[in-house]
Amino acid sequence: MVKKAIVTAMAVISLFTLMGCNNRAEVDTLSPAQAAELKPMPQSWRGVLPCADCEGIETSLFLEKDGTWVMNERYLGAREEPSSFASYGTWARTADKLVLTDSKGEKSYYRAKGDALEMLDREGNPIESQFNYTLEAAQSSLPMTPMTLRGMYFYMADAATFTDCATGKRFMVANNAELERSYLAARGHSEKPVLLSVEGHFTLEGNPDTGAPTKVLAPDTAGKFYPNQDCSSLGQ
C-alpha cells in the first residue's frame, strides 16, 4: 500500500508539472529557467477505452521527457489479427490539456483528472458519455508492437543512429548486422545518412557511457533503404 501511494503521489506531481499552471490556450513558451523546473519525467498510463465493435481497447500511453510519446492499443475480443497496434509522436501541453500529435500529424487530446488522464473528443472538449474514457497512472514497459518508422539511418564506428522524420528526434539503433550491411550497400562510397523505412519498436537500454536508461530503436524487419532521398522526398 505504501509503494502504491508513493507511485500515485509521484504521478500527480509529474502530471501537474506536465500540464503547467498558466491560462494560455497555446503551447507554452518557457524561459530556460522555467523549462528546467518543468522538465517532466517519463510517465505512463493504462486503461480500457470504449470500442464500437469489440469488448474494449486496452490502451497504454507512455510520455517521455524528450517530448515524444508511444501508445499501444489492443482490441479486446477482436476476431481479426493483428489486434494490437502501436503509434508514436510528439506531445505538448497547453493551459489545461495534453496534446498528442502522431507521426501522421493527427492530434488527440487529454486532460488531467487527479492522477489520471481523461480522453477528450477530436476538438479537445469533454466527452459526454456513460462510458469510461480514463487512463489510470501505471508503471509499464514500452510496448513491443511493431510500427512503421521512416528516418535517416547512419552507421559508423560500430554504432547506428536513426533520425525520425516525423518527430525530428535522433535515437540509437539496437545492433542489427543485416540492417548495417544493407546500409553500407545503399550508401555506396559516400559516408552519409540514407532514408530508411522499417518496422520497429522502442525499448530502453543502458547507455554505454553512463549506464542510464536510453530509448533505443529496435528494428523488427529488414527495412528498406532509399538512396539519394531524405525526409522531404515524395518517395519516402
Swiss-Prot record:
Phenotype of the disrupted gene, per the record: No visible phenotype. Slightly copper sensitive. Decreased numbers of stationary phase cells bind to hydrophobic surfaces, cellular adhesion has altered dynamic properties; no induction of cpxR when cells bind to hydrophobic surfaces.
GO BP terms: cell adhesion; cellular response to cell envelope stress; regulation of cell-substrate adhesion; stress response to copper ion
Gene Ontology MF terms in the entry: identical protein binding
Chain residue ranges for the region called C-terminal domain: 126-236
Region Could contain a copper-binding motif: start-end pairs: 144-156
Lipid attachment site numbers (S-diacylglycerol cysteine): 21
Main location: membrane
Signal peptide range: 1-20
Pfam families (alphabetical): NlpE, NlpE_C
Record note on modification: Palmitoylated.
Protein topology in the membrane: Lipid-anchor
Residues carrying lipid (N-palmitoyl cysteine): 21
Result of altering residue 231 to S: No oxidized monomer forms
Localization terms from the record: Cell outer membrane
Alphabetical UniProt keywords: Cell adhesion, Cell outer membrane, Copper, Disulfide bond, Lipoprotein, Membrane, Palmitate, Signal
Domain notes: The mature protein has 2 domains, the N-terminus (residues 21-100) and the C-terminus (residues 126-236) joined by a flexible linker; both domains form beta-barrels.
Subunit architecture: Probably exists as a monomer in vivo, can however form homodimers which swap domains.
Protein known as: Lipoprotein NlpE
Naturally occurring in which organism (per UniProt): Escherichia coli (strain K12)
The gene coding this protein: nlpE
